[in-house]
Amino acid sequence: MKVNLSPMVSSDFKSVLRKRFKVLAAFVSAVWAIQALNWVMDNSLNPAFGLIPRQFTGLDGILAMPILHGSFAHLISNTPPLLLMGALLAATATRALLAVNTIIVILSGALVWLLGSSAIHIGASGLVFGWFGFLVTRGLVDRSPITLGVTLLTGLL
C-alpha cells in the first residue's frame, strides 16, 4: 500500500525543503571537490587551512576545518552522517538553519582551538556532532519521538 503525503504537505514547505536539500547536496559535493583538489595537491591544503589550536595563524581553520579531510577514507566516513543528519536537519529545522550551522561551526572550532592537541585539526566531525546535539535537543524540546528516534538511530550508525 502506497501512501501519498503530497496533499498533507504544503507546496511552500516542499519548495523550502527542495531548496535546503539542494544546498546540502551542493555542500557535500563541494567538500568532495575540495578533497579531490587537496589530494591532487598532496594534501597541502590541510596544513595551510586546517585548525591549529592556540595559534592565531590557525584561527582561519575554524571555518575551513569542516570542508577539509585527511583522506578519501576520512571523507567517506563523514559523508553518510553529513547526508543523514543534514537531511534530517533540513527537514525539521526552522528559518534559523543558517544561524544553527554558523554557531555549531564557530563553537566547535573555538573549542578545538582552545582545548585540542597541537596537531592540525580537519574534518566535519564537529559539524556532524553539533547537528546531532541540536537534533537530539530539538527532539526533546519538541517532544518529537520521530525526530529523536531517527537522530539517535543515525547517531548509532
What do the PLM-derived regions correspond to, one by one?
Residues 2-157:
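A detector for small-residue-rich transmembrane helices and their helix-helix packing motifs
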